[in-house]
């Protein structure tokens, strides 16, 4: 009996060991399959800023490479991406500081069976909601690494213009002045034109918290690191972050990473749009995205044509912006892009000019209002929504136009009014503006903690003119 039990036990033990062996072999096969087939490499011959020139390496544009460097006697790698060619040279743009590289250092290209090279896969998933990530999808919030089922490559998805659904619905932004006077449609692309210190970040935070949208994607491109944290913790808040995805590429990272962050934020918005969600995309700022494109283009030897910007930059902005909007059979992406202007007197710098021409409207922030403590500091006279007449009632449109007329009349004659030189009865429109000016000012101002729905905004506008 004991011999039989011992024999059975040995048999079971052998089966378990054999099963373990099979599992180990299977695991080893997976690891072998994931190994690179080859590591091709070239030699570094020149470094100019973040631009690297390499010989002996053939790779398509967009390929991810690894450059050796020596720091404290240790050989480490930095990441770089192929951005161009020049005769027998391959041009790479470094994603990190080039400290520690040396002439003749090896530059590796990792190749696989089914792909020529690694171009960088970025995670896409509903798990991204509530997270703060960098341009590669790596966590910046100290939480666990993402492990989504879906990935994307950073490429531009061209939308057939005949597949774009018309803008017919009003988007409730929760901001009274915008809802009533610069009404935005679902799927519209709007520029927020502002110089520094005018409350741009506060306005964006209010939009992110109060806008009626299923998902909010926020791209912080080229901002100061301190401002990124301040925006997330103090302006957006935990409630706003819960339905948002924040992609941050601060000013101290490589221009190429800033470009990829803008594209990644747009890719996430496209992902949720395909899931039939109404997406709000906020990008701060489109100007810094253009500056990053300029840095890469100038490194490649392109000639500047307007205020230091090469011509290729002006084609990159429409490619990014045109990915948003409405599409048939899917949801929508309503996008707000901040555009930094040098001054209100001369806003027609090349980036501001191209943005005005391709966007569906613009909201201008005024330094005059900001200095008076008037927030949000929206310059109603110079702001416009191109789709507004098509999505609101005729009554609201006429009231909004008359409101703007009163504001413009008062502002043009402000100095005369302040010194008492204006004679009452000279201009009936100005008389009306002077009479209700405190009401107009109160309507345009809104506390950061205050939310004003579209219906209540229209009702308050209507009450002014009863």
Curated annotation (Swiss-Prot):
Any one Gene Ontology cellular component term annotated for this protein: type III protein secretion system complex
Gene: fliI
Keyword set includes Zinc: no
The protein, known as: Flagellum-specific ATP synthase
Gene3D superfamilies hit by this protein: 3.40.50.12240
Locations listed in the record: Cytoplasm
Sections of the chain in a coiled coil: none
Pfam families recorded: ATP-synt_ab, T3SS_ATPase_C
NCBIfam families, per database record: fliI_yscN
Catalytic activity, reaction form: ATP + H2O + 4 H(+)(in) = ADP + phosphate + 5 H(+)(out)
């Amino acid at each position: 009996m004991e011999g039989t039990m011992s024999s059975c036990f040995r048999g079971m033990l052998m089966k378990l060991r054999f099963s373990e062996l099979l599992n180990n072999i299977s695991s080893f096969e997976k690891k072998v399959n994931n190994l690179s087939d080859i590591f091709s490499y070239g030699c570094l011959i020149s470094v100019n800023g973040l631009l690297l020139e390499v010989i002996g390496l053939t790779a398509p544009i967009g390929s991810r490479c690894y450059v050796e460097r020596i720091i404290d006697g240790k050989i480490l790698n930095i990441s770089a991406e192929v951005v161009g060619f020049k005769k027998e040279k391959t041009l790479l743009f470094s994603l990190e500081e080039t400290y520690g590289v040396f002439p003749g250092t090896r530059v590796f290209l990792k190749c696989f069976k089914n792909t020529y090279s690694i171009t960088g896969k970025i995670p896409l998933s509903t798990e991204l909601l509530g997270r703060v990530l960098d341009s590669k999808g790596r966590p910046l919030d100290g939480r666990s690494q993402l492990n989504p089922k879906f990935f994307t490559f950073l490429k531009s998805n061209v939308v057939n213009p005949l597949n774009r659904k018309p803008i017919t619905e009003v988007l409730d932004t929760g901001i009274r002045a915008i809802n009533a006077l610069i009404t935005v449609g679902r799927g519209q692309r709007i520029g927020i034109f502002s110089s520094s210190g005018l409350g741009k970040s506060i306005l964006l935070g209010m939009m992110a918290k109060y806008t009626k949208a299923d998902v909010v994607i926020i791209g912080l491109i080229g901002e100061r690191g301190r401002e990124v944290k301040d925006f997330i913790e103090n302006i957006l808040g935990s409630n706003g972050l819960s339905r948002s995805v924040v992609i941050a590429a601060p000013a101290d990272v490589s221009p190429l990473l800033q470009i990829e962050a803008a594209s990644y934020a747009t890719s996430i918005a496209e992902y949720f749009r395909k899931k039939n969600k109404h997406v709000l995309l906020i990008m701060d700022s489109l100007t810094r995205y253009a500056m990053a494109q300029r840095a890469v283009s100038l490194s490649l030897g392109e000639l500047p044509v307007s205020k230091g910007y090469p011509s290729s930059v002006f084609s990159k902005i429409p490619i990014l912006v045109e990915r948003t909007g409405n599409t048939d059979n899917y949801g929508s992406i309503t996008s707000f892009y901040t555009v930094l202007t040098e001054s209100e007197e001369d806003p027609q710098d090349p980036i501001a000019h191209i943005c005005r021409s391709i966007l569906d409207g613009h909201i201008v922030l005024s330094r005059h209002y900001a200095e008076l403590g008037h927030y949000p500091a929206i310059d109603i006279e110079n702001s416009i929504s191109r789709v507004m007449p098509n999505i609101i009632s005729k009554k609201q449109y006429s009231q909004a136009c008359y409101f703007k007329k009163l504001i413009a009349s008062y502002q043009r004659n402000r100095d005369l009014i302040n010194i008492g030189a204006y004679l009452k009865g000279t201009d009936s429109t100005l008389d009306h503006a002077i009479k209700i000016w405190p009401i107009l000012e109160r309507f345009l101002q809104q506390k950061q903690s205050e939310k004003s729905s579209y219906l209540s905004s229209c009702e308050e506008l209507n009450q002014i003119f009863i």
